[in-house]
Amino acid sequence: MSDSRNTRNPWPEAYPLAVVTSAPPKSVAILILTLALVILQGCAARARHAAVPSGLDAKAIVSGMEYGIRYFPRDPERVQVFIDDYLKSLELEEAYLAKQGHTGSLPPIAMLAISGGGDNGAFAAGFLNGWTKEGTRPQFKLVTGVSTGALVAPFAFLGPAYDKKLKEFYTSISLKDIAKKRSILSVMTNDAMADNTPLKNLVKKNVDQDMLDAIAAEYAKGRMLLVGTVDLDARRPVIWNITKIAASHRPGSLELARSLLIASSAIPATFPPVMINVEVGNKKYQEMHVDGNTAAQVFVYPAAVRLKDVAETVGVHRERKLYILRNARLDPEWAQVERRTLPIAAQAISTLIQYQGIGDLYRIYTVTRRDDIDFNLAYIPPTFKTPHKTEFDTVYMRALYDLAYSMAEKGYIWTKEPPVLIPSSE
């Protein structure tokens, strides 16, 4: 659920050297670091099954599932799986519309991509609710989400009927509903600073069998819901087709879908990774999956896919619009940095994340121009100044929700290109 503010430490009194914005006195810092190193030298890593060997990872199949439920954007074979699935979605869409009495060519489509951003996910929640109220919110053929965007995505995919639940998800929670801090000793012997059992319970409460069945029903209409994680062993971004998982109706589908939403939000070292059991041939392995933000803060589909050309191979010519909800600002947040190691590192990481997100927008914009897709972007405006005292600050989230709701309800004027970093010579 990370964003450019993830260098803020939710529990500074417990972990002064963890995710840092303020460093302890030098002597205390040295003492803590020394103790940490001593403890770490005597600690064994948590047990796990072997990772998929290098060179075989593209062939791994999630235990109990079919091969084609996920895509690797840089692997030609897995990209072809996406192309095949997209063509299948066109067949399903055409068949569904024909049953509804539609004749002629397929109608224009809208796609929605929701970025990461931690508790800034309240922006997407408010915007979608306001968009419903305004009256022009489309039904999206494709919805994608990363990190907190992955948590928003199922609600957005299923439409206005789930607006109330989405609002509750992002305006009635606080940090205690997301994670529990661990003791220093537990941190040293475990795989993360925090226990995210509260978030798991929250996802379990909201993503139930009824929701999965509703998602499966949309698969039959040719719609797609995708979320992103990162396979940390292979250093590979992975795109998961939640609609296909739901429509398979296989045992374990619901648990896998929940696990993927948790994995997409699992900030490395802050929240535990999600271990996914896979198989290659008759051998069993385990993949370690973490926050999709590690590779990209927002995505639409593999850049290697020329969507317009793919559709035209089966005679489909249609208008396409892409809407991006960026759960973050575009302008950098100014701050005077203390001349100390940890604040410098924190600000540098924050800056890196900020510009990675902007780079993602440029990548997507380039693809939309190539594939003749209308680009539309919404983001948190620089005028939003509500204090952000801690992660998942309920007051902050409600204020952001209300702002986004108002923006959309009034009829938002979408930004048609990424921020200009180099002034035009024209």
Residues covered by each model-derived region:
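N-terminal secretory signal peptides that target proteins for export/translocation
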Residues: M1-P25
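Sec-dependent signal peptide recognition
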Residues: K26-L33
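C-terminal motif of bacterial Sec signal peptides marking the signal peptidase cleavage site
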Residues: I39-G42
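Patatin-like phospholipase
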Residues: A44-K141, F157-E426
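Catalytic nucleophile serine of serine hydrolases
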Residues: V146-S147
